[in-house]
Amino acid sequence: MSPPRDRVVEGCNLVGSTAKDRNPLCSTLPVLPDDILVEILLMLPVRALLQFKCVCKSWRTLISSPQFAMDNFRQRSSADRDLTSRLVYYNRLYYHCRVGFLPLQPLFNSPSATTKVVSFDMGCRIGALVVRGSCNGLVCLHHLQSCCLRLWNPCTGSASQWFRIEFNCFTYYGFGYDHVHDKYKLVTVEGQDLTVICTFGANSSTIGPKFPSPAVGLSGSIGKFVSGTGTLNWMAKLTGSAANERKWVILSFDLANETFGQVPLPRLSGGGDNTCDPELQVLRNCLCFTIDHNNTVFDVWMMKDYGVTESWMMISRVKLWRHKYNNPLTPFSISEHDVLLLMLPDRRLVLHKSDSGLLYFPLIDSSSDAHHFPICSKTNFRIFFLYHDSLVLPPQ
């Protein structure tokens, strides 16, 4: 007979428990103080913590608390973000409402072994469901036909209530966390200048500041969220600048103050040889961008200290063969050994070793997403975001 659910782990100190809750046969074993036990639990991965909720009522209460969930996420992320990182994607073939997850740790550690994609049928038979971003382990979902938003935690299965928004077609948008007010926000830009801020929990939509007029074009519609700064960021070309003049700035939006600003780019030498627009991304929670030279050499720059021009440094140079595509090189993640996961201009995923310059094509099994091209051959119609496992609860 299997043991009772509150006695799966015996001989341990249960947070908030009394002597009667512990096994008397194991009373001679050393007992950990509650604060040390909590510190140990904070270091555990999400899957283990979900299992440990069955140990006893006090553990379930602790692990289910919002503060523990956020503390666990921050501690695990700061220790090694690769352990909890995945790429989450949706496909732009709207009649296939599936969301897929590609784990990054096995991809970096064993590129010659097959890494499997886990995909979910989101059950939308009418209308399209798209992903608008991911932050703190929460995925922002947007149902286009009903004009509704919700936040979803794939690890726990919990989700917020749908709430309706007034605008459905975005020119630009970005999803992030306002750590000052403890709010998750989706910022959308309608047309050329109307900014709408959708706040989860309050389930409200408000008109924000006018979109800055100096920026007449953005490189990419999706704003990049930098955790800790509370900002969304877009690459923007200034008014009147020619395509070959490199007059680009990073346009930022402060989620707490709800104001626009600018972040300086590094001082780049040369010019006139760029085929595609710069591509803005976030690596190691730092702003990064790639810029090309004749579409065959791509430099990857990282801003170590947000907002400080002198902190920009080139972290990698990727050399490619000549090709017919005018798409940028897109970095998704970087391992502790400085291996970059990139999407090539032809939409294939590749691993790049910065020290040797070698490229490796990882083996990926995306058969669970059978409606699409296999990811290992081409990522067509897929929009990717970086996702981290967490126990964080969506606001209600």
Model region roles, listed by residue range:
Residues 1-396:
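N-terminal entry/capping and adjacent linker segments that precede and initiate structured domains
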